[in-house]
């Protein structure tokens, strides 16, 4: 008998019929003797609908009250799924995040989990219940409802698995695992049987929508055995995400080609080249709670430098506004921006021991006439910023160049 945490996303529970199908799947697992904790998202589109209602009332909704509103989406799903499980003859009990004491900090709309009180869940499991928990939400020390941000249900599932020392955390989505790249761009893309936490973390940070990045961080930190599966397939092993030493003896050089369209570039031109200037630019950006990704500095011969960095496209206007205020203070000439960029990355733990990956990547892009605007590297990743019009071509040619359509 195993203790398994299963998480079902909004698409998986998007209709009452799909909720019934999920209940049938859960019933099969319980009949095999497993103890089950189920984490669910709101039904497809429900969170956006609730945010829309809030914005109809208040253009910039109060974060505390917005959390109260959007947390109701998961509450509907847990109740419906518990009823569906009862119809399958199972004992089921549903809980909101606050009810099971998923304790978070007080950062509304982007809270982080601090602690989970698992006693109530363990008692229900011992009594033979399937425990259904609302993802995406918790409660702070003062008793305020909090939410974890987009994709937070993945984090809830992994955090519960860590707290309960579950044998496995299964993330059910509308895809059957992690692929070498998006099959919609490269039909020959392969499903990976396994991938390391490091690789999955890079791919999640680079825009892969299979798993939310914080959930991968959590799983890696607490060594939670994580598996991605499709809720629309009866069979299939999905993709196992594991620590590197548990993976196959010889790693492939590259495991996947990831990409992100949600990128924009900002450049501060004519910046005085003096110590501390990077902090003077990026400090106010950080104070505005904006995330910076890639950074490049071009030093000129006239005592000035051009300072460029990338942000999420959705935060471009806010970041540009901050820079316009900074410009006069630091004596820069101009702020320019470009929303028409993308990021493409080659990811793989195997590149640690195989030189020449970067040169192969750059040569492949050059042969297609694709100009590289920015470059960033880590031990297991090489990322380039390109004109967005080249995204799909770049992904296809790199996938082919690294022979990812063939199993190693």
Language-model region placement:
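Residue-level detector of flexible, active-site-proximal loop/helix-junction positions
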Residues: 99, 233, 379
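Short hydrophobic alpha-helical runs that function as membrane-insertion/retention elements
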Residues: 168-172, 226-228, 293, 374
